[in-house]
Regions:
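Non-catalytic terminal extensions that flank enzyme cores
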Residues: 1-47
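M16 family metallopeptidases and their MPP-like homologs
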Residues: 45-55, 81-129, 136-147, 174-199, ...
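Generic recognition of flexible, low-complexity loop/linker segments
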Residues: 94, 210-214, 273-276, 319, ...
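Non-catalytic, conformational "gating/processing" segments within enzyme and secreted inhibitor domains
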Residues: 158, 210-242, 723-758
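Long, compositionally biased intrinsically disordered regions
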Residues: 432, 445-533, 671, 680, ...
Length: 972
C-alpha cells in the first residue's frame, strides 16, 4: 500500500525536496481538514509534531498556559504529568512544547520505532483530549493561583508560567522585544505577548482559558508533520483511525491578518528595572525597526539574513561601525525575525544614552544612504551567503534533531499558505540566485525600499528606571492586600481551603493504574554497548595529533589545542578577553573586517575558546587548553589554515580603539548572559569555592570574568599599552609547537589528504615556549548572593563527593534523572512554582542542585537538604525503576553529528576515560536496582554538607535571607 491508496487523505502535492534529501508530501485529511506535511528519508531520528495556529487576543498568556497544561494528563493517559513520565521513561531525542507569537507546537523525536509511536500517541491525546476540562487545579498550578496559608498571612500569586514570565520580563531584552512588536503591529495578534505579561496573567479566568482551547485545538486548525525513516502509510492509517476520523471539519477563524503599513514611523518609549543604586547612564536600548515584506517571499527570507551580516552583524559592518564610532551603544547588533507573517528587521544599540535616540536614527539612515550610493561590500555579501548556505548544508543544530529544525522552518511559510510548507527548505537555488545578485544592485534596492523608504517602522527606546521592580512588587502587594481586605471571612476561608486543596492535589501521586496506561519500552530495548571512541594517535613535526576516523561528509573538523595550565589565576581574565578578541582584530594581511569575510567565504567558521578537563586518573592533574576550532570543506583547507595562522601568529593588539570596542561589546553581552543563564552562572560560582574546573569557568565566562572585563575596560582608558602588551604576551606564550595538540575529525582519506597542509602550518609556529607548573589558585567564598533587578531567583547548592571519599558510578547518572523528574520537579516546580530545577554529578566529583526562575530562596535550599531522606526511602517497583533507566539511556544515546562524535572522543582522550569505563557505567545503569540508588544517600549528604551556595536574584528576597551568606554584592 502507498500513500496514494489512502482514501482518507487528499494528496495536494508530492515532489522530491532535494535540498534535504527527502520525498515531500502535502496532504489534507478529508474528514477533519487537518493539514499534513511529510519529509520521508533515511534519517532514523524520526520527528513528529502537531501544531495549532493560536493568535492571542490579550496579554494573559493563554496560549502559553495551554501549552503547559495540555501535557498534564489526558483521556487515554490520565497521569498528572505524562510529559515528565515520558522524560523519565522514553528514548526520546527531543521532547518539548513551544509557544510562538502565532502558533503552539508539540514536537517529539526518537530513533526507536516503538518509542516514536508511543510518543505520538501520548502527545496527540494530550492536545485533543486533555484533562484541563476536568481539573481546574491544572490551570492553577501551571498558570496562576492565589496562595493564602492562613488568615493573617500575606496573600500571594504563584504559578509556573507566572513565575517564568516574571523572570522573562526582568530582562530589558524581553521588554524591548515585546515593545517592538507592539509598536509595529498594533492591529493584529503580534502586538500581544503570547507568553503572557505577568501584570496581566492573573486576569485570565479559567473559563476564558477553556474557551481559547476549544476554539483553536481542533484538527481543522492543525499542522501535522512527519519526518524520517518510518512506515509513513502505517502512521497515516493509525493517525486517521485513532484521532482524525473522530472529528468533522470545522471552520476555525485563526488566520493572521496583515498589519496595514503606517503613514509615518512610530516612536515608542518604555522602561525596565535596575536596582536602586545602579547608575542610569549608558543603560538605554535604542532600536530602529522595519517590517520587511512577507514570509512567503523566498528571496527576501534569505536576503535579509545576508543583509543582517553585511550591514551590522559582521566585524566592522558599516552600520555597526558608524554607531560605535559615534559612541552610541556598547553593543550594536541586528535582529531579523522571519518566522512571522510580516518579518521584522531591526538595528539595536545596547547601553546607549536616551539623549542619543535622534542621532542613532540619523546615523543609521545616513550610513544606509551611503551604502546604497557606493554599493555594499561584495565580499561581505558573499560571506553572509556562504555562511548561511554552509549552516544549511551541514544541518548541525547541536542537540536538536535536524528534522525538527526543518519542520519548524516549514511553519514559517506553511502557517500562511497551505501549499507552501517546503519553500524555505528548497533554498540552495535561492542561495545561487543571491550569489548572482551580488554583482547587481539587488541588495542596494532592498535597503532603499525596505529600510529607507519604508514608513512601516518604529523607533523603540527602552530606558532604565531605578527600583521599578520594587515599585511593581509594592503595587502588587498593595493590590493583593486591598483585595484580601475586601473579602469576607467566608471568602478568606475559601482561599485558604483552595490553597490547601491545590497542595494536596499536587502531593497526591497518580494512581498506579493510570501510570500503567502509559506505553513503555523494556530494559531489553536498550542498546547494550556504549558508543565507541575513535582516538588514533599520530605525530607531525613533533606535534601529537589525535585523529577521529569518522565519516564527515567532505567537511574537515580540526581543533588546535594549546596547553594553558600554567597561566596564573590573575592572567585568566586577560586570557578570557584574548579568547573573545582573537579573530576580531586585524592581522598582518587582513583588516578585521576582511578577516571575518574571508573566514565566512572559505570556511564554516573559525572559533576560539578554552577547554577545562579534569584528569580522571589523577585528581591533582587538571588539563586546561586554549582551543581553536575550524570546520572547512576539504577543497578549502589550505585557505582555512592560512587564515587561522594569521589569527594566531600575526594578530595586531596595538589598535586600542578596537580593543575598547570589543571590551564594551563583551561587557554588554555578559550583562545579559549573567541574568538569562543565571542558573549555570550560580552553579559554577558556587562550585568555584572548591573546584578548579568551576573556578576556571567562572574566571573565563562567569561573574569573575565580568569583574575582570570591567577592570580591563578601566585599564584601557588609563594605560592602553599595558593591555596591548599583555594580549601580545599571551599569544607569544601560547602559540608554540611544544604546547600544541591537534584533533582531526574525518575519515582516513581526508586525514591523509590534510597531512601536508597540517605540516605546513605547524612549521610556521615557534618550536618552544617555556611551560611552567600548574598555577596555584585561590577559591571563592562558599556562601554568596548576587543582587540583580529581577523578580525571581536562581538558587544553587553544590559540593564534591570525590574529595569526601566516594567514587563515581553509573548509578549517579540514574540518580540525576530520578531527582530531576521526580523529587525536584515535584517540590521545586510543581509545589514551589519555579520554572525549572536541575542537578548534575560530574565524574570529577563536582555536583550541583540549581533552580531556574524560582520565586523562592530558603524554601528551595530546604528542598535540597531533604534529598538524602528521599533517596533513603526510594523504593520504586520494577516498572518505575525500568522507566528511570530508559530515561537515562535517552541522554546516553542521543544521536551525534560527526563534529560532536569527534569532540566526545577527544574529551575522553584528554580526561583519561576509557571505553571499558563507560561500558562499565552503562552496565551499572542497565542493571541498577533500587538499593543501588539508596546507597547513594550518604554520597549526596556529603555533597550537601559542603554547604556551598550561590543565589542570583531579587534584592528583597536576598536581604530577607542575608544570614545565609558570607558575601552579598550586586551582580553587575
Amino acid at each position: 500500500m502507498t500513500i496514494h491508496d489512502l482514501a482518507e487523505y487528499e494528496i495536494l502535492d508530492e515532489h522530491r525536496v532535494e535540498d534535504v534529501q527527502s520525498d515531500g508530501f502535502i496532504l489534507r485529511h478529508k474528514k477533519s481538514g487537518a493539514r499534513i506535511a511529510i519529509l520521508s528519508n533515511n534519517d532514523d531520528n524520526k520527528v513528529f509534531y502537531i501544531g495549532f495556529r493560536t493568535p492571542p487576543e490579550d496579554e494573559t498568556g493563554v496560549p502559553h498556559i495551554i501549552e503547559h497544561t495540555t501535557l498534564c494528563g489526558s483521556k487515554k493517559f490520565p497521569v498528572k504529568d505524562p510529559f515528565i513520565e515520558l522524560a523519565k521513561g522514553s528514548l526520546n531525542t527531543f521532547l518539548n512544547a513551544m509557544t510562538y507569537p502565532d502558533k503552539t507546537v508539540y514536537p517529539v523525536a526518537s530513533c526507536n520505532d516503538q518509542d516514536f509511536k508511543n510518543l505520538m500517541d501520548v502527545y496527540l491525546d494530550a492536545v485533543f483530549n486533555p484533562n484541563i476540562t476536568k481539573y481546574e487545579e491544572i490551570f492553577k498550578q501551571e498558570g496562576w493561583h492565589y496562595e493564602l496559608t492562613g488568615k493573617d498571612d500575606e496573600l500571594k500569586i504563584n504559578g509556573v508560567v507566572y513565575n517564568e514570565m516574571k523572570g522573562a520580563y526582568s530582562s530589558p531584552d524581553e521588554v524591548l522585544s515585546s515593545q517592538i512588536y507592539r509598536s509595529l503591529f498594533p492591529d493584529n495578534t503580534y502586538s500581544k505577548d503570547s507568553g503572557g505579561n505577568p501584570e496581566y496573567i492573573p486576569k485570565l479566568t479559567y473559563e476564558a482559558y477553556l474557551d481559547f482551547y476549544h476554539k483553536y485545538y481542533h484538527p481543522s486548525n492543525s499542522y501535522i508533520y512527519l519526518y524520517g525513516d518510518m512506515d509513513v502509510v502505517e502512521r497515516l492509517v493509525w493517525l486517521d483511525k485513532e484521532y482524525l476520523s473522530l472529528y468533522d471539519y470545522k471552520k476555525v477563524n485563526s488566520e493572521i491578518n496583515k498589519q496595514s503599513a503606517f503613514d509615518k514611523i512610530k516612536n515608542v518609549e518604555a522602561q525596565y528595572s535596575i536596582t536602586m543604586d545602579d547608575s542610569q547612564e549608558n543603560k538605554t536600548y535604542l532600536s530602529y525597526n522595519r517590517v520587511v515584506g512577507d514570509s512567503l517571499d523566498e528571496m527576501l527570507y534569505q536576503a535579509f539574513d545576508v543583509l543582517d551580516y553585511a550591514l551590522v552583524s559582521s566585524p566592522g559592518a558599516p552600520v555597526k561601525q558608524a554607531l560605535i564610532d559615534a559612541g552610541i551603544g556598547d553593543d550594536v547588533y541586528g535582529s531579523y525575525d522571519a518566522g512571522i507573517l510580516q518579518p521584522v528587521f531591526s538595528f539595536v544599540a545596547k547601553n546607549a544614552n536616551a539623549s542619543q535616540a535622534d542621532e542613532f536614527e540619523s546615523i543609521i539612515e545616513n550610513t544606509l544612504k551611503e551604502v546604497v550610493k557606493t554599493g555594499i561590500n561584495k565580499e561581505a555579501l558573499l560571506a553572509g551567503i556562504n555562511s548561511s548556505e554552509f549552516k544549511f548544508r551541514e544541518a548541525d543544530f547541536g542537540q536538536f534533531p535536524k528534522g525538527l529544525l526543518f519542520g519548524l522552518n516549514c511553519l514559517d511559510s506553511w502557517l500562511f499558505d497551505d501549499m507552501k510548507p517546503f519553500i524555505h527548505l528548497e533554498c540552495l537555488g535561492t542561495f545561487a540566485k543571491l550569489r548572482k545578485a551580488v554583482d547587481t544592485d539587488y541588495f542596494e534596492k532592498l535597503i532603499q525600499e525596505y529600510l529607507l523608504d519604508n514608513t512601516h517602522g518604529s523607533s523603540v527606546t527602552v530606558k532604565p528606571k531605578r527600583g521599578l521592580g520594587n515599585e511593581r512588587e509594592e503595587a502588587l502587594a498593595k493590590e493583593l492586600s486591598d483585595y484580601k481586605a475586601s473579602l469576607s471571612d467566608e471568602e478568606i476561608k475559601k482561599l485558604i481551603e483552595d490553597t490547601e486543596h491545590l497542595k494536596k492535589y499536587q502531593e497526591e501521586p497518580s494512581p498506579d493504574e493510570d501510570l500503567r496506561k502509559l506505553p513503555m519500552l523494556t530494559r531489553a530495548d536498550m542498546k547494550k554497548n556504549a558508543m565507541p571512541f575513535s582516538n588514533i594517535e599520530d605525530e607531525l613535526l613533533d606535534v601529537k595529533v589525535v585523529r577521529h576516523d569518522i565519516e564527515s561528509n567532505g567537511i574537515d573538523y580540526i581543533s588546535f589545542l594549546f596547553d594553558a595550565g600554567d597561566f596564573a589565576q590573575s592572567e585568566l581574565g586577560y586570557l578570557g578577553f584574548f579568547t573573545n578578541a582573537l579573530g576580531l582584530v586585524s592581522t598582518e594581511k587582513y583588516s578585521y573586517t576582511d578577516l571575518a569575510n574571508a573566514t565566512n567565504i572559505y570556511t564554516g567558521g573559525i572559533s576560539t575558546g578554552t577547554a577545562s578537563h579534569p584528569d580522571i586518573k589523577d585528581r591533582n592533574n587538571f588539563v586546561f587548553k586554549f582551543e581553536v576550532k575550524l570546520k572547512v570543506l576539504e577543497k578549502n583547507l589550505d585557505k582555512a589554515l592560512e587564515l587561522m595562522e594569521q589569527m594566531l601568529l600575526t594578530s595586531d593588539f596595538t589598535d586600542t580603539k578596537r580593543l575598547g570596542e570589543l571590551v564594551a561589546q563583551i561587557k554588554a553581552r555578559l550583562q545579559a548572559n549573567l541574568s538569562s543563564s543565571g542558573h549555570l552562572v550560580a552553579a559554577m560560582r558556587s562550585m568555584s569555592s572548591f573546584s578548579r574546573y568551576a573556578l576556571y569557568q567562572d574566571e573565563l565566562k562567569g561573574i569573575a570574568f565580568y569583574r575582570s572585563i570591567c577592570r580591563i575596560e578601566k585599564e584601557l582608558s588609563e594605560s592602553p599599552k599595558s593591555v596591548s602588551d599583555k594580549l601580545a604576551a599571551i599569544a607569544r606564550k601560547l602559540f608554540a609547537r611544544n604546547r600544541m595538540l591537534i584533533s582531526f575529525t574525518g575519515n582516513n582519506e581526508a586525514y591523509a589528504n590534510a597531512k601536508p597542509s597540517l605540516e605546513k602550518v605547524i612549521a610556521g609556529f615557534n618550536k618552544m615556549s617555556a611551560v611552567g607548573d600548574q598555577a596555584e589558585v585561590h577559591f571563592n567564598t562558599a556562601k554568596e548572593a548576587f543582587i540583580d533587578a529581577s523578580q525571581i531567583q536562581y538558587v544553587a547548592k553544590t559540593g564534591d563527593f570525590i574529595c569526601e571519599g566516594y567514587e563515581y558510578t553509573g548509578a549517579l547518572r540514574l540518580l540525576r534523572v530520578i531527582l530531576s523528574y521526580d523529587y525536584l520537579w515535584i517540590n521545586v516546580r510543581v509545589k514551589g512554582g519555579a520554572y525549572g530545577c536541575m542537578n548534575t554529578f560530574l565524574r570529577s566529583g563536582e555536583s550541583y542542585f540549581v533552580s531556574y526562575r524560582d520565586p523562592n530562596l530558603s524554601d528551595t535550599l530546604d528542598v535540597y537538604d531533604r534529598i538524602p531522606e528521599y533517596i533513603k526511602s526510594f523504593s520504586p517497583d520494577e516498572r518505575d525503576m525500568t522507566k528511570y533507566i530508559i530515561g537515562t539511556f535517552s541522554a546516553l544515546d542521543t544521536p551525534m553529528n560527526p563534529e560532536a562524535k569527534g569532540s566526545r572522543s577527544l574529551s575522553a582522550y584528554l580526561e583519561g576515560i576509557t571505553y571499558e569505563q563507560i561500558q562499565k557505567e552503562r552496565n551499572e545503569i542497565l542493571n541498577a536496582q533500587p538499593e543501588d540508588i539508596r546507597r547513594l544517600a550518604d554520597l549526596v549528604e556529603a555533597v550537601l554538607k559542603k554547604d556551598s551556595i550561590c543565589v542570583i536574584g531579587n534584592e528583597n528576597m536576598i536581604k530577607e535571607s542575608a544570614g545565609l551568606f558570607e558575601n552579598v554584592e550586586k551582580l553587575i
